[in-house]
C-alpha cells in the first residue's frame, strides 16, 4: 500500500487569467473616490454629502454579504462571479447614460444609483471570487495567488484617477473612465463565461444563514 501523499494540482496561469481579470473588475469599486471628486465639483455638493457616496458603496456589504453566500451555494461560484460582473457593468453604464442623455438633478440621481450598483456588485464579487480561485489553486500556493489577485485589483484603483485626468484635460470628459472600464469589464465577463471550470456542484440541500 503506497504511503505517498497526493499533492494538489494547481492550474496554470492561463487557466486562472479570467479570474485575475475578475479581480481587476473588483477594483472598480475604488473609482468612486475619483468620481466623487468630479461630481462634487460639478454639482456643488457639500463635503458631508460627497462622503456619503463612498460610505454608501461599502454599506451594501453589510446587507448583501450573507444573501450572496446563500446565492453562491445555490447557483455555484462562477455564476455568482458572473452576476457580480454584470451588476458592475450596469454600474459602469449608468454614468455614461447620465452624461450623454441627462443633465442636472436627473444626472446626479443616475450617478448615485450607479454607485449603489457598484457597491452591490462588489459585495457579490468579494463573497464569491476567492472561493472560485480555490478551484484552480490549492495548498501552499493559494496564499500567494490570492495576494496576486489583490495586486491586480489595486491596478484598477491606481489607473482610475489618471484616466479621469486624461479624459478631463484631453477630451473634456472625465467620465470616459467609465467607458474604458465598461469595455474592460465586458472582456472580463466574456473570458470567465467561456472558461471551462470544473467546480464543485452547488449545494443541493437547503441553504440557510447558518450554513453560509
Question: What are these language model-derived features?
Answer:
Residues 86-104:
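C-terminal ends and interior cores of transmembrane alpha-helices
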Residues 148-197:
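Helix-loop-helix hairpin linking two adjacent transmembrane segments in secondary transporters
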Residues 8-35, 116:
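Pair of pore-lining "gating" transmembrane helices in MFS-fold secondary transporters
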Residues 114-151:
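Cytoplasmic helix-loop-helix junction between adjacent transmembrane helices
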Residues 38, 69-70, 74:
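Membrane-interface helix termini in secondary transporters
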Residues 34-48:
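Short amphipathic helix-loop junctions that connect adjacent transmembrane helices
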Residues 55-70:
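Central cavity-lining transmembrane alpha-helices of secondary-active solute carriers
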Amino acid at each position: 500500500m503506497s504511503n505517498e501523499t497526493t499533492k494538489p494540482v494547481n492550474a496554470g496561469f492561463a487557466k486562472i487569467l479570467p479570474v485575475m481579470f475578475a479581480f481587476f473588475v473588483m477594483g472598480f469599486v475604488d473609482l468612486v473616490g475619483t468620481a466623487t471628486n468630479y461630481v462634487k465639483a460639478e454639482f456643488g455638493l457639500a463635503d458631508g454629502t460627497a462622503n456619503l457616496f463612498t460610505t454608501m458603496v461599502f454599506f451594501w456589504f453589510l446587507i448583501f454579504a450573507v444573501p450572496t453566500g446563500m446565492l453562491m451555494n445555490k447557483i455555484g461560484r462562477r455564476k455568482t462571479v458572473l452576476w457580480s460582473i454584470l451588476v458592475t457593468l450596469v454600474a459602469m453604464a449608468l454614468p455614461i447614460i447620465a452624461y450623454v442623455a441627462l443633465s442636472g438633478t436627473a444626472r446626479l440621481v443616475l450617478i448615485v444609483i450607479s454607485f449603489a450598483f457598484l457597491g452591490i456588485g462588489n459585495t457579490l464579487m468579494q463573497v464569491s471570487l476567492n472561493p472560485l480561485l480555490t478551484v484552480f489553486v490549492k495548498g501552499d500556493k493559494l496564499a500567494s495567488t490570492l495576494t496576486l489577485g489583490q495586486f491586480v485589483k489595486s491596478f484598477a484603483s491606481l489607473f482610475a484617477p489618471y484616466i479621469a485626468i486624461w479624459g478631463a484635460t484631453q477630451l473634456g470628459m472625465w467620465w470616459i473612465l467609465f467607458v474604458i472600464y465598461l469595455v474592460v469589464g465586458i472582456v472580463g465577463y466574456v473570458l470567465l463565461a467561456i472558461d471551462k471550470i470544473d467546480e464543485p456542484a452547488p449545494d443541493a440541500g437547503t441553504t440557510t444563514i447558518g450554513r453560509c
